[in-house]
């Protein structure tokens, strides 16, 4: 073998080994500029995490990489405007973009699979270019962006969704079939239209400050359902049969109709309060049992749950209007010991309130001591939901 070949072949082998190693790294690879990103283009699969440096001012294009077996992180950068990955279809870690105040474009047209998405403080990001649609992710957390919609994120199954404080978002629509931990949509554009047409099963659902919510296929909730401060006039869960924890419908100022035609069981508390236009509650025709407290207050003239035969906790119904007939029906349940806890049912009060509240009658006198709570589990259920809202 010529002497030059004896030198060249080992050198070529070493270069090949070095190249292979450059696509697999144990430490996080930090991208300082566009050139660093271009240097990874020959890696169709990159094993390791990539971080974009806080001082980067270039647009970053991670073209060539089809699979990133790690995280993609960019944070605390006030200069970067565009992040793209034209060939990326799978990201096995987290896409974490936080505090990128000038970022206006995230372009990954082939991306479909991500372990988790976490976006926060992206005030100029109005849309996502996920043309192929991300349909697999375990967690989605999007807060404080300028997104107008979630077009491009169309998850089928998820552990956790938290979408909050996105003041411009007009629409949230996903093909979600089940939510194993929680879905929270809170404090976005108060007119946002929420559509979850395929959602059948979930653990916990919380909707706060939404313009409309559609869950036509929802059948089972293992946890709680909370509707707070929404703007819609009606809410329906036409196929929901059971709720594993609490149902809370609170402070929805335009709400005049609620319909749960197939709901038979609420394991913890039923709480309906401060919905000023909700004067009739007749949307629970099949409800048989409440494992915690029955707690309804407001301006109602009529409350009917014709098949209810078990309330394990306290019964509280307070209204500013006349509910004499309603109270007579529920007094019958109490007399038959089908309501196990304390009982309070009263109308024509100035300040109807939730259980534990001692209202003032329209004549100006107090109505008597408030009933104590006997359903500890029910109380814990509502406390947990309150904690979610404070998060």
Q: Which sequence ranges carry the predicted segments?
A:
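Cleavable C-terminal sorting propeptides in eukaryotic secreted/cell-surface proteins
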Residues: 366-391
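Low-complexity, Pro/Ser/Thr-rich intrinsically disordered segments
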Residues: 348-373
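Concave beta-strand-loop units of leucine-rich repeat
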Residues: 25-39, 46-61, 69-103, 110-125, ...
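Extracellular/surface-exposed low-complexity segments
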Residues: 14, 341, 382-384
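Sec-dependent signal peptide recognition
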Residues: 2-10, 378-382
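N-terminal signal peptide
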Residues: 2, 12-26, 387-391
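Rossmann-like adenosine-cofactor binding region
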Residues: 218
